[in-house]
Amino acid sequence: CFYEIVDDYLRLFHDKEGRIMYDQMSDMRNRYIDMDGRMTFGTVGGYAVQSRGDGGYYVKSRGDGGYPVQGRGDTGYSSQTRSDDACLGQGRGEVDTGMSYDASTGVCTDINRGDMSSDINSGLYSGGRMDDSCHTSESRRMDDPCGTDESRRLDVPCHSDDHYRSDNPCTDDSCQAEDRRGGHSDSHRIDISSEESASRRSRNHAFAEGRMSEMRLRYMETCRRVLPFMERTLEMQHGGDTFFCGDEMMLCDMMCYCALENPLMENASFFGQYPKLMALRERVASQINISQYIKRRYQSDF
């Protein structure tokens, strides 16, 4: 879909450079498609055989109604069971997977690895009825792909409800009685969750308050270092008599006013030692163009 969208876009806007890039991407895409097509080189006896690039090949699947097989034609096999009493691979005459099947004894043997299984006629694949046990034939097939090895079979005992009630302490009558009393009730869990939420909010609030106090202290310390320099600068302007001359409001006036607002609200006597700064603040506040705004303005937090 990406290539179709880009193609429509380039056709609509006539982007020459984009068209060149799109053609290059299309050529690369076609080359990858051709490479993928050459990877699969046909079927052998109903199997789709695909090359691996290292001299071997993969046997991917069958097309005759049997179960799919995934195998390696060079070093070994990896086979699933079939429902027609035959191990896939050797014995059907299609692809040599290193397996040998004896129909008289029901033994499926790996030539490279030796005898892997025995007795596949125990009812799993001969059409007989499965015994009513806790484990299924699917789990046996996963353990032994060519049959069932009696020595490897693990029968999982089926326990009744009384067995689990006696072993599990949370299923006996005492635990149920505790549930009725509210020991593990939903309301108890809700109370715990609400308490945890309240505790988390309290911690966050305390952290925010501590952070705010830290920022205020840092700001006040910055003012203690910067304001003396600002005071000396105002005294240098025309001998300190006409600093920031002019009737129009200047940007530096407004910046100075905003910089002095919060520390003055924190401590009214903070500017007692900076008379020029206090005079500047009063001058800014008395400007006609900005006085109404200053009166409406509320204290901004950090």
From Swiss-Prot:
InterPro entries, A to Z: Glutathione-S-Trfase_C-like, Glutathione-S-Trfase_C_sf, GST_C, S-crystallin
Motif (Cell attachment site): 52-54, 62-64, 72-74, 113-115
PROSITE patterns in the record: GST_CTER
Keyword vocabulary terms for this entry: Eye lens protein, Repeat
Basic and acidic residues bias spans: 129-166, 177-192
Transmembrane segments: none
Signal peptide bounds: none
Residue ranges of the region described as 4 X approximate tandem repeats of G-G-Y-[AYP]-V-[QK]-[SG]-R-G-D: 45-84
Region Disordered, annotated ranges: 68-92, 118-205
GO molecular function, one term: structural constituent of eye lens
Record-annotated GST C-terminal domain positions: 183-302
Role of this protein: S-crystallins are structural components of squids and octopi eye lens.
Protein family according to the UniProt entry: Belongs to the GST superfamily.
Name of this chain's protein: S-crystallin SL4
Organism in which the protein naturally occurs: Nototodarus sloanii
